[in-house]
Amino acid sequence: MAPVSNQAGGHVAVLAFPFSTHAAPLLNIVCRLAAAAPSTLFSFFNTKQSNSSILASDTSVLRYTNVCVCEVADGVPEGYVFVGKPQEDIELFMKAAPDNFRKCLEASVAESGREVSCLVTDAFFWFGAHMADDMGGVPWVPFWTAGPASLSAHVHTDLIRNTTSGDCHDEKETITVIAGMSKVRPQDLPEGIIFGNLESLFSRMLHQMGLMLPLATAVFINSFEELDPVITNDLKSKFKRFLNVGPLDLLEPTASAATTTPQTAEAVAGDGCLSWLDKQKAASVVYVSFGSVTRPSPEELMALAEALEASRVPFLWSLRDNLKNPQLDEFLSKGKLNGMVVPWAPQPQVLAHGSVGAFVTHCGWNSVLESVAGGVPLICRPFFGDQKLNARMVEDVWKIGLRLEGGVFTKNGMLKSLDMLLSQDKGTKMKNKIHTLKQLAQQAVEPKGSSTRNFESLLEMATTN
């Protein structure tokens, strides 16, 4: 356990969901809270594997003497052999999570000598309501890692199930019974709401979450109120408090967070990306990235590469090593492409760079919000989870991007999308709209902005009990 100030203070226990990209943004917020409340202890509970992954690319958390990064068991029984079931690792973790977290909390309290004064959890952990009650009724403050539209869909799951046909092939039916969702079709919703295996452990967990979140002291989210005012106001009416505290990447960094950190291999690679972008024309570069989890097929990756070659537009492609294949490697090694391929890129800085004019993305929420913060319109190829819903909001509600023709990468479809976004009037309108949203995002994190005020409320809630 990291050293902690001897000054008396509260103890905020933070329970992270260790899969996908849930844990890192939660730890980001924890560090900001810790910097503002140095006498409060923040115990961050996450699996060893997830903690290692986060710390491998960002060691800044180690500077905070009042943040303790702790390990919780992954729920996999000793000697267990995985059989390849969908979400097998998630189900094992979730089944054991309540007991495992309780044991870790008891050990943390015993070691630190501080009782838990506030419980912050990933929103998936609906059982946080019961844990908070068992600890004497401390505040339970869950964090929703995706966007407000997907949160609204989960909170209104029963209403959606009772009022829609559930026909995922009906292109005309939309979700008209929920504020701000009139452009959303049933097939845009995440699995587990009206299609998919509704009886899986994961689907039942999400349904229970939607029922329990209104009991929370507050729910907070990495977004800003001005992006989705209608949905935000509806969620405010459903929760005791609903706090938009983003975009996180635009929040004023603390003095501690702004200090120089040792250069990791990824940081060096990032410097190379930014130096290359410095040499390109304004708004000319297409940035391509599918996050850390999504896996497009080899056929789609080849179609994308062929389209980039044919378009001759400069591009920066963050291509993970586990997505490469011999055919793609051979194609990329020919040297005919007008761009740069790297295994990792510092995405917020890339999207904030003036040379970037388009973002080809899987539409994960963090990527969408970072694109808004950077003022870069999107070309969307969603795959799973909330990504289809995010893409629908991008194209039909905010009108700051477009989805691929046919929904998958083809050479011709990608060329059409690039031409439309970079060269046609429709693309100019998208750029203007996302520039307006960028300005609203910047205003939200100003000293008197909505996200700054909400962050201050979150800080007070977490540290004054």
Swiss-Prot record:
An anthocyanidin binds at H22, Q87, H154, G385. Highest expression detected in fruit, with very low levels detected in petal and leaf. The keyword Lyase does not apply. Keywords: Glycosyltransferase, Transferase. UDP-alpha-D-glucose binds at T145, A345, Q347, H362, W365, N366, S367, E370, D386, Q387. GO terms for biological process: anthocyanin-containing compound biosynthetic process. GO terms for molecular function: anthocyanidin 3-O-glucosyltransferase activity; quercetin 3-O-glucosyltransferase activity; quercetin 7-O-glucosyltransferase activity. Signal peptide: none annotated. Pathway: Pigment biosynthesis; anthocyanin biosynthesis. Belongs to the UDP-glycosyltransferase family. In the presence of other necessary color factors, this glycosylation reaction allows the accumulation of anthocyanin pigments. Anthocyanidins are the preferred substrates, while flavonols are only a minor substrate in vitro. This is Anthocyanidin 3-O-glucosyltransferase 2. It comes from Fragaria ananassa (Strawberry). The lineage of its organism: Eukaryota, Viridiplantae, Streptophyta, Embryophyta, Tracheophyta.
